[in-house]
């Protein structure tokens, strides 16, 4: 029994390592060849694994790409704070934390930036599903935390968040793909990014009054 348990544990570890190698291969190809390079044979070759594992572990190329997209997305990895953190201010501090964390996360994650751009130019099921999952996560946070606080003005708060989050996406992508200066602020410098962070905090404070 003990030997069987060790064998099963080893098999599980090998499976997870292989899955991670395939995910890493997707990332490497995205960085070198772009989305057009994501072909089954190329992914398997880059990972140094049999292409059958792509089907065994992910159901195929699309399933692997979907898993990679979810692993990179900020909102797919946000846990519901209602289950772990006491919310006593209508979600004001939580809103600040999420916006500031996202501003930092998107800036540092070039792969997520590519996924965000990909979602704007291609009608792909996995990207549509990702957008739907983001909306579901957002709905849980809005309905459970901020809607009760804002009451009749709940939609106004959601509109403010839509502007701030989309602004974060644009500024972070702009900073890493074009000149880093926007409205006279160097978005790659600590000073410039601090100004944006302070602006986000200021706008949340004003929204909550």
Predicted features by range, described:
Residues 1-17:
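N-terminal intrinsically disordered/low-complexity leader segments
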Residues 65-72, 130:
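Alpha-helical DNA-contacting segments of helix-turn-helix folds
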Residues 21, 29-63, 67-68:
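Helix-turn-helix
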Residues 15, 19-27:
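Short, leucine-enriched amphipathic alpha-helices that occur as contiguous helical runs
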